[in-house]
Amino acid sequence: MSGHSKWATTKHKKAILDSRRAKSFAKLIKNIEVAARMGGPDLAGNPSLELAVTKAKKTSVPADNIDRAIKRGAGLTGEVVDYTEIMYECRGPQGSALLIECLTDNKNRAASEVRLAISRNGGTIADPGSVSYLFSRKGVVTLPKNGLSEDDVLMAVLDAGAEEVKDNGETFEIHSDPKDLQAVRDALKDAGIDYDTDEAEFVPSMEVPLDLDAAKKFMKLVDALEELDDVQNVYSNADLSDEVQAALEAE
């Protein structure tokens, strides 16, 4: 799940099951294949591929798997890689909104599985454009505080195109135009600042607070969507307060 409110930390603290880890690897490999197909196998000349590979390495995808995915995507193995990107829009509990980003080799399968997961878990498929206008595409870098202040981070990345630095409690989140993501990453490296994640994401313009009951339903919906092989990312404008997070973690 990709999100920009503090509720995301709740999911990060859950135990990672082997099945989830395998699904995560498969999705990262798919991203590499698509990036290599679109821009070629050279990381230096293909920023999208470089980002996909960096993310895979941070998630401990084996180097051999990454290398094979690059070659497969670039057509160097004779295999055909043909994925289609699809975005579904969904209304969740208590006025929350979700964008579901899919990467699939079978559009009919993806549509059927996404719709079923939504309908079975209290969501409603929304018309195209009725949810997406609530989000904008941003480059997002998340980093641990490690004793840094918000000003420390902002000064390091301001000239690289950073638009804002958000304080998420345990972490900072840097927003930029997606085209400036590489420059922001480089600026952090030059300043000796470590970061956890970096990618282009859909960021909500406003967040919607959920109470405990709605949060439970929301998490169930997100879990069902993330279990689907064709779903690459789920973005939302849901916000969970510290109290709601604590109640979820206590269950």
UniProtKB/Swiss-Prot annotation:
Highest taxon of the lineage: Bacteria
Coiled coil: none
Annotated InterPro entries: Integrase-like_N, TACO1_YebC-like_2nd/3rd_dom, TACO1_YebC_N, Transcrip_reg_TACO1-like, Transcrip_reg_TACO1-like_dom3, YebC-like
Family matches, as Gene3D superfamilies: 1.10.10.200, 3.30.70.980
Iron in keyword set: no
Presence of the UniProt keyword Lipid biosynthesis in the record: no
Name of the protein this chain belongs to: Probable transcriptional regulatory protein Arth_2304
Organism (species): Arthrobacter sp. (strain FB24)
Species lineage: Bacteria, Bacillati, Actinomycetota, Actinomycetes, Micrococcales
